[in-house]
Amino acid sequence: MKFVEEVVVEEFLPTFRSLLAADLRERGLTQQAVADVLGVSQSAVSKYATGDVAQNELVAEDERVRDLVERVGEGLASGDMSRVQALVETEVLIRRLEAPGDVFARLHEADVPELAAYEGDFRVHDPESELLARERVRSSVGRGVRALEHAGGFATLVPNV
């Protein structure tokens, strides 16, 4: 069982941070200044700079990710954007990338093939999703069947057809 949030942590964050660190360095910030802006250690920025942190190609090549990196990099470097705004802008993009069929949904389906087998659209966080309703019904039917299997004498009531 792997949560979509794990996809964000394992695939998006290292990729996004390394792209943003590179953007900020290109704008003239020192490694320490980049570390301060990103809220990470200077050592982490050094790893981003030397390519020691793997990037997810699907995330790195997404135009929306690239646009956000450029916008946030420019805003943070110039002081026109606060760290809070950068965080919120990034969170908004993360939610968009979780949409059915989008980047995180595809990565999540690759890690949890059972999700790919489901033919409808769904949002993992939607408490009213069709997928969740279907899985709850499946579980309920399973509990009912198990209860019937263990009910004494029930088998004699079922006709042989």
PLM region spans:
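Short, Lys/Arg-enriched anionic-surface-contact patches
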Residues: 1-17
